[in-house]
Amino acid sequence: MARAKRVKRDSVTHIYQTCKQAGTCPPDVLNKVEQTTVADNILKYGSGGVFFGGLGIGTGRGTGGVTGYRPLPEGPGIRVGGTPTVVRPSLVPESVGPADILPIDTIDPVEPTASSVVPLTESSATDLLPGEVETIAEINPVSEGPTIDSPVVTTSRGSSAILEVAPDPIPPTRVRVARTQYHNPAFQIITESTPAQGETSLADHILVTSGSGGQTIGSDITDIIELQEIPSRYSFEIEEPTPPRQSSTPLQRTQTTGRRRGVSLTNRRLVQQVQVDNPLFIDKPSKLVRFSFDNPVFEEDITNIFEQDLETFEEPPDRDFLDIKKLSRPQYSTTPAGYVRVSRLGTRGTIRTRSGAQIGSQVHFYRDLSSIDSEDPIELQLLGQHSGDATIVQGTVESTFVDMDIAEDPLSESIEAHSDDLLLDEAVEDFSGSQLVIGNRRSTTSYTVPRFETTRSSSYYVQDTQGYYVAYPEHRNTAEIIYPTPDIPVVVIHTHDNSGDFYLHPSLRRRKRKRKYL
């Protein structure tokens, strides 16, 4: 019997944090974290009455090492538990001379009958300084500050005071508009002007051209200097078309000199070559091996392994995929003709041994899609701000001018001036979007159109209804039935009846009278 493996318990700290709130902590965990074990209680209560600090008890051997103990040098004593003394710098005493003694006048005691008003008398002040000091007052003009209007207080007898406060005047505001332009070498802006007479401002480039016309005053002798064309910084080079690419997303990979492991797919001696025309081979190759349901979430970009029962034989949807037990993931390559090829390596399980091993050949399934050719270069336009392609709309220019030839020209086919034909409406009615509705006898809707008698040309009032209604003349040829008068009862006689009987008309039958019984 195998012994169960012992599972180590979690740390004491983590157990205490999780079980403290629920109150399910084990006693050993609770005592160890809260320090309430027997050893903790002995140290806690024993240290309160016994102090072993001065005995030198420790975990060492007590021999003092090789050289033994050395007595510590004596030094100043240290008071334990006392308040530290703060040393402050001493103050340097300064000598102060005797101050001038001022004469003090004696004040008579104040009698109760004396007045409480103290008269002010002029007294000569005592000079404190030995000599007179000349004082020069310098007047500096003070800038005028904001004037503050004093409020007007209106007070009437028997009413409260009214304080009228005037609003502060608003100083005029000066607005200054400035334009700052910073040169950014990473951003190039194209500024062009419309070829018209005018002025262009706020332009980043100024083009000065001469020889645009005008009148020259003076001699016509000018010096011709041979100039060299400076290429524009906005010019670009058109690259030559690149050769056809070998893959849709080419990657730069280092070529390995070693021999590739495995069998090459194009080896016809070892691998059977089968070309597949079914488009399901690209994304759903499992449907070519066996019948299955479609799962839109699953992408078959992996190696598929198919397991078949030994006692059953299933015909695959495609005969080329018979006995396929393994189909690899897709591999993309190019053919010498320039086509993109999708390849999958399959393994057949044709022969099965008694041990269960399957033996079969390898098959290379491939499908050629298309070729990847270089596209024609597209002429690109410069990105920037320019006004050369702007559309100028002028209302006066868009007006229509009619040139009427007043003079008579016998050879011209124009309309005569001031002719009434100019007032005719040449609009052409277009019924391309109309619908012709012709009703039958059963579902016919009739509308009454009133007619107004007037001396002018006849006009009609047509009711506005939904859809299009076409009025057309309708003639019906109905046969007129002439009924015989007077109505004579008809006696029906069967000529083919040999019995000689007859049938009376129901109107000739005698009516039954209802009689009352007494």
Swiss-Prot record:
InterPro entries: Late_L2 (IPR000784). Disulfide bonds join C19-C25. GO terms for biological process: microtubule-dependent intracellular transport of viral material towards nucleus; symbiont entry into host cell; viral penetration into host nucleus. Its main location: virion. One of its GO terms (molecular function) is structural molecule activity. Signal peptide: none annotated. It is found in: Virion; Host nucleus; Host early endosome; Host Golgi apparatus. Residues 238-262 are annotated as: Disordered. Highly phosphorylated. Keywords: Capsid protein, Cytoplasmic inwards viral transport, Disulfide bond, DNA-binding, Host endosome, Host Golgi apparatus, Host nucleus, Host-virus interaction, Late protein, Microtubular inwards viral transport, Phosphoprotein, Viral penetration into host nucleus, Virion, Virus entry into host cell. A motif (Nuclear localization signal) lies at residues 1-10, 510-517. One of its GO terms (cellular component) is host cell nucleus. Interacts with major capsid protein L1. Interacts with E2; this interaction inhibits E2 transcriptional activity but not the DNA replication function E2. Interacts with host GADD45GIP1. Interacts with host HSPA8; this interaction is required for L2 nuclear translocation. Interacts with host importins KPNB2 and KPNB3. Forms a complex with importin alpha2-beta1 heterodimers via interaction with the importin alpha2 adapter. Interacts with host DYNLT1; this interaction is essential for virus intracellular transport during entry. Minor protein of the capsid that localizes along the inner surface of the virion, within the central cavities beneath the L1 pentamers. Plays a role in capsid stabilization through interaction with the major capsid protein L1. Once the virion enters the host cell, L2 escorts the genomic DNA into the nucleus by promoting escape from the endosomal compartments and traffic through the host Golgi network. Belongs to the papillomaviridae L2 protein family. This is Minor capsid protein L2.
